[in-house]
């Protein structure tokens, strides 16, 4: 199966400018292609992973990737299907975020070896050297206002208002494609389906300015089986940066994917062969309660993003927390597994008697409730049940002299911080 048809089989091709021509180009030749990443945050997230992994698949098939960091466009802000205008960031912030994105991309694309090793470019390099007058004369004249207004991403913002800054974004992205086509013979741009209007601005500019042929391929914006935008956990983005979303949190995210989505996501987010995925599908449908598809997803993606060691740590944290074995984990692992649970910083004047501390730290609302919970065996300190109403937190309860973990009932965790 050629690479284009495999991408289609995996559900990774949403729209193309000319499917037959693109398939032929990928089958018969060596294609240089690019994907752009604007530094709109200090990390990429799961939403970016579809395009990143598609880029990697093409590289493995022998084609050459260019990764464009939008040092210039990141200063402007893409209006595509955004309800309101993005807040403008400082140059220093955009540079810092761009550097972090570079580091993350190197985890997925091969930048060091091979004839088709990836190349990193920054559009600030060419936009910083072109004057506004030259840009209007040499680029702007190829775009009619009617053409620009026809883009769906612009139409959706006309009613609420769109600044000229954001309106001009599509020309900037189009010029990126032109520059890469002219200087590196890049003939294919890959991006999310919400980028279609900006991306085809590039093919139009290449056609009109240099009479060249170029292609666009969009990957789908992933939604779950309920239609909800994929890539968020509890309303928050799932980041590729371990400091923003821990490997454990990412592991849990994939483990909790709905049955209806699991096999589809294996095709999109893993490098398992289609035959391997089909075998998993058969086993999964025979015994969905064993969650083979979700466990495989979690293993493959966490290992891909964070490495095998981080994956094994995430599994261990999951197993130990499920068993209530708090002492079997390091403080570092506990902080991963219990990120997001209520934390209380113990003050020097706090009474460390269990009844008082349960109220002070917010575990319960009253001393009466605290006494009832302790008496009924509902309170655990570092995994050990406490039923002594006079129990006082001691140095022995401070894990690595830093935290104490309280559990109320089966699942409600609280962390006491002593630092």
Curated annotation (Swiss-Prot):
Q: Name one GO molecular function term.
A: tyrosine-tRNA ligase activity
Catalysed reaction(s) here are: tRNA(Tyr) + L-tyrosine + ATP = L-tyrosyl-tRNA(Tyr) + AMP + diphosphate + H(+)
GO biological process terms on file: tyrosyl-tRNA aminoacylation
Residue ranges annotated as motif 'HIGH' region = 39-48
Identify the SMART domains for this entry.
Answer: S4
Q: Which GO terms describe its cellular component?
A: cytosol
Per its UniProt record, what InterPro entries does this chain match? aa-tRNA-synth_I_CS (IPR001412), aa-tRNA-synth_Ic (IPR002305), Rossmann-like_a/b/a_fold (IPR014729), S4_RNA-bd (IPR002942), S4_RNA-bd_sf (IPR036986), SYY-like_C (IPR054608), Tyr-tRNA-ligase (IPR002307), Tyr-tRNA-ligase_bac-type (IPR024088)
The UniProt annotation puts motif 'KMSKS' region at 229-233
Q: Cite the Gene3D superfamilies for this sequence.
A: HUPs, RNA-binding S4 domain, Tyrosyl-Transfer RNA Synthetase
Q: Name the family the entry cites.
A: Belongs to the class-I aminoacyl-tRNA synthetase family. TyrS type 1 subfamily.
Q: Which PANTHER family does the entry mention?
A: TYROSINE--TRNA LIGASE, MITOCHONDRIAL, TYROSYL-TRNA SYNTHETASE
Q: Which NCBIfam families match?
A: tyrS (TIGR00234)
Q: How does it assemble?
A: Homodimer.
* Name of protein: Tyrosine--tRNA ligase
Please report the organism this UniProt entry assigns to the protein: Streptococcus agalactiae serotype Ia (strain ATCC 27591 / A909 / CDC SS700)
Q: What is the lineage of its organism?
A: Bacteria, Bacillati, Bacillota, Bacilli, Lactobacillales
């Amino acid at each position: 199966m050629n690479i284009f048809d495999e991408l289609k089989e995996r559900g990774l091709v949403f729209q193309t400018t000319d499917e037959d021509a693109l398939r032929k180009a990928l089958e018969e030749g060596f294609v240089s292609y690019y994907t752009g990443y604007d530094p709109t945050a200090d990390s990429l997230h799961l939403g970016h992973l579809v395009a990143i992994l598609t880029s990697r698949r093409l590289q493995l098939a022998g084609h050459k990737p260019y990764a464009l960091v939008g040092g210039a466009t990141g200063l402007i802000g893409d209006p595509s299907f955004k309800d309101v205008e993005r807040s403008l960031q400082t140059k220093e912030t955009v540079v810092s975020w761009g550097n972090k994105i570079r580091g993350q991309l190197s985890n997925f694309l091969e930048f060091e070896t091979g004839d088709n090793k990836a190349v990193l470019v920054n559009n600030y390099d060419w936009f910083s050297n072109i004057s506004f007058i030259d840009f209007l004369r040499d680029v702007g004249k190829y775009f009619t206002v009617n053409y620009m207004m026809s883009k769906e991403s612009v139409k959706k913002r006309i009613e609420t208002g769109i600044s000229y800054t954001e309106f001009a974004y599509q020309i900037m992205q189009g010029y990126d494609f032109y520059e890469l086509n002219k200087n590196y013979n890049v003939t294919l741009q890959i991006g999310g389906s919400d980028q279609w209007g900006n991306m085809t601005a590039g093919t139009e500019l290449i056609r009109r300015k240099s009479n060249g042929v170029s292609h666009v391929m969009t990957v789908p914006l992933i939604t779950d089986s309920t239609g909800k935008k994929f890539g968020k956990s509890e309303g928050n983005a799932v980041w590729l940066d371990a400091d923003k979303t821990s490997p454990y949190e990412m592991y849990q995210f994939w483990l909790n994917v709905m049955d209806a989505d699991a096999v589809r996501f294996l095709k999109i987010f893993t490098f398992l062969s289609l035959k391997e995925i089909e075998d998993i599908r058969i086993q999964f449908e025979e015994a969905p309660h064993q969650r083979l598809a979700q466990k495989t997803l979690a293993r493959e993606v966490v290992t891909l993003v964070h490495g095998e060691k981080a994956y094994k740590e995430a599994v261990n944290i999951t197993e130990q927390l499920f068993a209530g074995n708090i002492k079997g984990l390091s403080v570092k692992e506990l902080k991963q597994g219990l990120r997001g649970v209520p934390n209380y910083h113990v003050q020097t004047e706090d009474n460390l008697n269990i009844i008082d501390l349960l109220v002070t730290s917010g575990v319960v609302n009253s001393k009466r409730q605290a006494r009832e919970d302790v008496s009924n065996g509902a309170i655990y300190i570092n995994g050990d049940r406490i039923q002594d109403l006079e129990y006082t937190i001691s140095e022995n309860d401070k894990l690595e002299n830093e935290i104490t973990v309280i559990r109320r009932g089966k699942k409600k965790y609280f962390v006491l911080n002593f630092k």
